[in-house]
């Protein structure tokens, strides 16, 4: 895994970035050359210095991709003249460009990876490729994408265009401040795109305004996300495996992971979103409205996009429409507070386990307000769950010990009735009844606890609060394996990391199996039981070796408490046996 990560970070990603940049630059040049050819052939007559906007028939309408010529032309982006504007708030820095008035960078001020601010958007400044909140104007038989249109950028209240590299600072003293992008076509048609920022929220309002007279064909506005998000974690392959695209339509939620798909939907549009393990970007309709949506993906390169088509409502000759952008962490409480159902994207397990997972997450966060160390909080949760299931596990351990005590008598029955299975079954059940032993008593309580463990697994593995949360010493990130040292060679199944908690957990499981004892019986059964006692701790150590250290810490504490409980039960049973023996002697 470490070698794959090194290859991704040091060789593959930089190389692919160069290839992608070259491809985008080539496409941009081809666009400009195409516009020049159209002007020289007279298709753009009367629009000197202005590129003819290319209207494409929507693929989801006709599938033909035919091209027609617009009545009015808009300036086409020239790569050398693209201006990049940065908006800085206490929560994030976002960059927008005059190429389509799109958002091309979003860095979160409160989250870092290897010392650098987390960057969510996998997009550069090349025009015509779409980005976050890219817009296309849709008609019955044509589409006008704005990605290649050259806008001018203005700060709120200013009539002077912003220059390349301008920084607009928005703090608590300037809530609701905005950034505006304007363009005028050859026939006077105007389009304005705007962004409004709240310095205390990860939500950005993005809107568009234009006169319906200049663009009479427009029936709806398409808002797009994609072609993916930038990996934010050190372990790039694992982070890419968590890439998802999702959609809420009415009361239905649609989620797709990496793969080949192209699905279209119609209904009441709420939102569409892209997400990695800990962060998400979502397009939300301010008010749910009837429209269409599309989700696309390619397995080969992880390409994923989402788009929503919302109707263009005209008022007094003007069309205005907006969406809300959420660009930030997958924080359950923050997403739930939006009232859009985006908290459904938090990985909390199946719909049957989500209520339990939500309760566990709530407990985790509340305890952390009192104890500012998530490692100690996890230990307390482990102790609490052990107390909660104490009687169940007590019955389980006691039942297993009782079964061990019955093994000699059960073996005698097998020898006595080895040729009569029906009689053997009857006598076995009779023995269980006389001894007051339930053959399922050892495993049933453990089965009942499994949903809780699965719930804790989901919460501890996916919650943003544990990202880079330290415990103590070398354990500086409970969302990652605890790495004490790195070996010069990679070991099979384990990699080159030296992790302590999984080894301690495996050792604890071995001690627990020794204390629990093995099943008495013939030599072959005893040998198998002993082999199983040694194998299970090894299997669990390998299984948990690359798990988040917060989850391993929970299981380690649970194992230590189980050792104490088993020891206590054994001591009680031995004392009872001695008392029975002494009573038998005196009587």
Regions found by a protein language model. Give the residues of each.
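Juxtamembrane extramembrane loops of integral membrane proteins
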Residues: 9-125, 181, 585-587
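Helix-loop-helix
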Residues: 1-33, 38-39, 96, 208-209, ...
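Soluble non-transmembrane domains of integral membrane proteins
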Residues: 79-346
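N-terminal start-of-chain detector that recognizes signal peptides
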Residues: 59-70, 177-181, 252-256, 293-300, ...
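Intrinsic low-complexity, intrinsically disordered segments enriched in polar/basic residues
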Residues: 43-49, 54-57, 61-64, 68-72, ...
């Amino acid at each position: 895994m470490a070698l794959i990560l090194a290859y991704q970070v040091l060789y593959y990603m930089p190389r692919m970035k160069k290839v992608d940049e070259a491809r985008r630059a080539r496409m941009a040049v081809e666009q400009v050359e195409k516009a020049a050819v159209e002007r020289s052939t007279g298709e753009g007559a009367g629009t000197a210095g202005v590129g003819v906007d290319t209207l494409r028939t929507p693929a989801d309408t006709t599938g033909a991709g035919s091209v027609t010529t617009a009545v009015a032309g808009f300036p086409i982006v020239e790569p050398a003249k693209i201006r990049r504007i940065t908006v800085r708030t206490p929560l994030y820095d976002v960059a927008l460009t005059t190429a389509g008035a799109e958002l091309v960078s979003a860095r979160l001020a409160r989250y870092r990876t290897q010392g650098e601010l987390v960057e969510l958007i996998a997009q550069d400044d090349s025009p015509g490729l779409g980005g976050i909140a890219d817009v296309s104007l849709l008609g019955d038989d044509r589409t006008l994408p704005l990605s290649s249109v050259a806008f001018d950028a203005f700060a709120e209240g200013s009539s002077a265009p912003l220059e390349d590299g301008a920084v607009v600072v928005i703090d608590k003293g300037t809530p609701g401040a905005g950034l505006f992008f304007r363009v005028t076509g050859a026939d006077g048609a105007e389009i304005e795109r705007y962004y409004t920022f709240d310095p205390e929220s990860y939500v950005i309002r993005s809107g568009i305004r234009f006169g319906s007279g200049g663009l009479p064909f427009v029936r709806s506005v398409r808002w797009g996300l994609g072609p993916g998000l930038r990996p934010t974690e050190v372990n790039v392959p694992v982070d890419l495996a968590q890439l998802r695209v999702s959609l809420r339509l009415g009361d239905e939620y649609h989620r797709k992971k990496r793969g080949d798909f192209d699905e279209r939907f119609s209904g009441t549009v709420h939102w569409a979103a892209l997400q990695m393990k800990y962060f998400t970007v979502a397009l939300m309709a301010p008010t749910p409205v009837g429209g269409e949506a599309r989700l696309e993906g390619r397995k080969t390169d992880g390409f994923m996009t989402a788009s929503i088509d919302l109707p263009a409502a005209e008022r007094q000759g003007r069309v205005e429409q907006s969406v809300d952008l959420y660009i930030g962490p997958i924080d359950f409480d923050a997403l739930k507070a939006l009232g859009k159902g985006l908290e459904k994207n938090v990985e909390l397990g199946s719909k049957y386990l989500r209520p339990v997972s939500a309760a566990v997450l709530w407990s985790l966060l509340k305890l952390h307000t009192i104890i500012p160390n998530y490692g100690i909080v996890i230990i307390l949760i482990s102790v609490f769950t052990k107390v909660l299931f104490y009687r169940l596990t007590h019955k389980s351990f006691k039942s297993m010990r009782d079964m061990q005590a019955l093994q000699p008598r059960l073996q005698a029955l097998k020898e006595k009735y080895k040729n009569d299975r029906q009689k053997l079954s009857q006598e076995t059940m009779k023995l269980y009844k006389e001894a007051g032993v339930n053959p399922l008593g050892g495993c049933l309580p453990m089965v009942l606890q499994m949903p809780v463990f699965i719930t804790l697994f989901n919460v501890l593995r996916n919650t943003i609060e544990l990202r880079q949360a330290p415990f103590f010493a070398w354990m500086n990130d409970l969302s990652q394996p605890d790495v004490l040292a790195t070996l010069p060679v990679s070991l099979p199944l384990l990699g080159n990391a030296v992790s302590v908690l999984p080894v301690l957990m495996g050792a604890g499981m071995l001690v627990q199996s020794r204390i629990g004892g093995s099943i008495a019986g013939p030599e072959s059964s005893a040998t198998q039981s002993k082999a199983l006692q040694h194998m299970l701790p090894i299997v669990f150590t390998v299984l948990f070796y690359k798990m988040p250290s917060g989850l391993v810490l929970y299981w380690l504490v649970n194992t230590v408490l189980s050792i104490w409980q088993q020891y206590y039960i054994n001591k009680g049973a031995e004392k009872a046996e001695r008392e029975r023996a002494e009573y038998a002697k005196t009587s």
